[in-house]
Regions:
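N-terminal lobe/hinge region of extracytoplasmic solute-binding protein
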Residues: 38-93, 123, 218-221
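Gly/Pro-rich hinge or "lid" segments in bacterial periplasmic/extracellular proteins
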Residues: 57, 74-76, 154, 164-165, ...
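Extracytoplasmic/peripheral linker and loop segments enriched in polar/acidic and small residues
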Residues: 170, 320, 335, 367-368, ...
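Structural transition elements
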Residues: 344-380, 395-402
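Periplasmic-binding protein-like
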Residues: 190-192, 286-287, 312, 316-355, ...
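Ligand-site clamp/hinge motif
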Residues: 124, 213-216, 241-287, 417
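Periplasmic binding protein-like
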Residues: 37-38, 110, 276, 403, ...
Length: 544
């Protein structure tokens, strides 16, 4: 059995620090190696834009090899903040953060990184559209309709306001100094800068692109690798950027290939076609480890698997039915049967890293497995056995199909009639046509504060509310408290109340288990897996 490691993050606040496509790994004389990585999916939206592709699969291909922020996440360490494109930062006040840029950083097009690029990366044109820096109000796609091919996709401004609800703008103090101005106080500004989305792009490349799509399929960034070739739904090849500020990249190319079936990823790895095979379910670990010259690395990560409810469904509009569904699931049985005990059932939508900021709610737990209580709640609700649709993807998440089948059987034993509807992609999952019911999802802690994922995913501009799956007025009021209050005790009290609302009184979701990632690889490769979806191929994580 693989050891499961837990990583704790640093605090949020103040810190200083100073095209040939190769089918497999090749060692040529005087040349760096290249690797091929089999993944279940490269991106969901067929773009390489961090704001448009906010996904687990996106994390894998984006970080830390391609996109970089002013503050970076310590992917191979405690997942806390480390200096990136900024060398130092300081608070001016509760609403203002100043950062000094690293000098001499080159973009992939040869331009030097300056304050102008940072200002642009958080501008209305690049990110916020016609939105205003006000929290607590849901922004829908229909509020932002592009009128030209150069404008942002309708969803992006609302996604931007998930992470930056009150950012009023970024000011260039001089060529290498910027100030972030928030409309409200925010104790998590530093954390938001190393969260998924806050990475920096080149202004000139955006201006020169003929359309948003052209830009988004080959963004110009500062990372150690740049886009060589991108074939949506097929492959992505990143090539070394030898002018990288952090030193010469160790690989010539990183090629991600889309291989949806687990068996095909495993067989391709063992045959030598691939150097890495991602998202292996635990029942495949022994197969890979038994083969000479191969190993599996993995751990739990800062992501929880959840199932979420659509309250426009007449049956699920009744919170008693949703509560019944949460008490009908034996989470530990799922962990034991499908994960071989290699992950855990967390205490609701909480992560151990919240303890570093004293925001962890002790004594809280996921809903207990209690089929009798579930049956009693259904009786109180007057449930008559009508079908509840369960839109399901085929193993987008590890073990997803098997997990869905197990849950349907558990619901059946409690008297719930849940019917699986297999879908091919996320567009079909979210299709407003037809009747929605329950679906799978996951929730990530991008920083060590519950503003992610509680507010960013379930608050007024979380996907749940933007897609009109669920809403709760008190939850939205508390989201503003979590986003704007500088009173730590008040913030913690608000978070505790959010858990009560979202997991007990008016369920938006139910947490199933902490996610874990397992990657099969050639044992000869001197590389270590991060406790994340991300795969680090920088020089400090690759040796020959």
């Amino acid at each position: 059995m693989l050891p499961i490691t837990r990583r704790h993050t640093l605090g949020l606040f103040g810190a200083t620090a100073g095209s040939l496509i190769l089918p497999r790994m090749t060692f040529a004389q005087g040349k760096r190696p290249s690797v091929t990585i089999a993944v279940q999916k490269i991106t969901n939206n067929n773009t390489l834009d961090i704001w448009n592709e906010q996904s687990n699969v996106g994390e894998r291909v984006f970080f830390p090899n391609f996109w970089e922020g002013l503050i970076n996440r310590d992917w191979m360490g405690n997942q806390g903040p480390v200096a990136g494109l900024a060398t130092e930062w300081k608070r001016i006040d509760d609403k203002t953060l100043e950062l000094k840029l690293r000098q001499g950083v080159k973009f992939h097009n040869g331009d030097e990184l300056t304050a102008e690029d940072v200002v642009f990366s958080f501008s209305k044109e690049r990110l916020f559209g016609n939105t205003e820096p006000k929290g607590g109000k849901t922004i829908y796609e229909s509020d932002n309709k592009p009128t030209t091919v150069k404008e942002l996709p309708a969803a992006v401004p609302g996604i931007g306001r998930r992470l930056w609800p009150a950012l009023a703008g970024v000011e260039a103090i001089d060529k290498y100094t910027v100030r972030f101005h928030n409309a409200t106080p925010d104790v998590t500004l530093e954390g938001r800068l190393y969260a998924f989305g806050s990475q920096i792009t080149n202004r000139r490349a955006w201006d020169e692109a003929a359309s948003y799509t052209d830009w988004a399929r080959k963004p110009i960034t500062t990372g150690p690798y740049m886009v060589g070739e991108y074939k949506p739904d097929v492959s992505l090849t990143l090539v070394a950027f030898d002018e990288y500020w952090g030193g010469r990249p160790p690989l010539e190319e990183i090629r991600f290939v889309e291989v949806p079936e687990v068996a095909s990823r495993v067989n391709g790895l063992l045959s030598g076609e691939y150097d890495f095979a991602c998202d292996l379910p635990p029942d495949q670990i022994a197969t890979v480890q038994a083969a000479s010259g191969f190993e599996v690395q993995g751990s739990t990560i800062l992501n929880h698997r959840v199932s979420v409810f659509n309250t426009q469904n007449e049956i699920l509009a009744n919170p008693l039915v949703r509560r019944a569904m949460t008490h009908a699931i034996d989470r530990q049985a799922i962990v034991d049967a499908l994960w071989g005990g290699q992950t855990v059932v967390p205490p609701g939508l909480q992560f151990d890293i919240f303890k570093t900021t004293n925001m962890f709610i002790d004594g809280w737990a996921a809903p207990e497995y209690n089929p009798q209580l579930a049956q009693d709640l259904l009786k109180q609700a007057g449930y008559k056995g009508d079908a509840i649709p369960f839109r399901l993807l085929n193993n987008y998440y590890t073990n997803q199909t098997a997990n869905g089948q197990v849950m349907v059987e558990m619901w059946k034993q409690a008297g719930l009639n849940v019917e699986i509807q297999m879908k091919e992609n996320w567009a079909q999952i979210h299709d407003p046509e037809g009747v929605k019911g329950v679906r799978d999802w996951s929730a990530s802690a991008n920083i060590n504060d519950p503003v992610t994922p509680m507010v960013t995913q379930f608050g007024p501009n979380g996907e749940m509310q933007q897609k009109k799956d669920w809403t709760n007025a008190e939850m939205n009021e508390l989201s503003v408290v979590l986003e704007t209050s500088t009173d730590r005790a008040l913030r913690k009290k608000a978070y505790a109340r959010m858990l009560e609302i979202c997991e007990r009184e008016d369920p938006a979701y139910q947490v199933l288990h902490q996610n874990a990632v397992f990657t099969g690889m050639k044992s000869s490769l001197k590389w270590k897996a991060a406790p994340a979806f991300a795969m680090d191929f920088r020089s400090n994580n690759w040796t020959m």
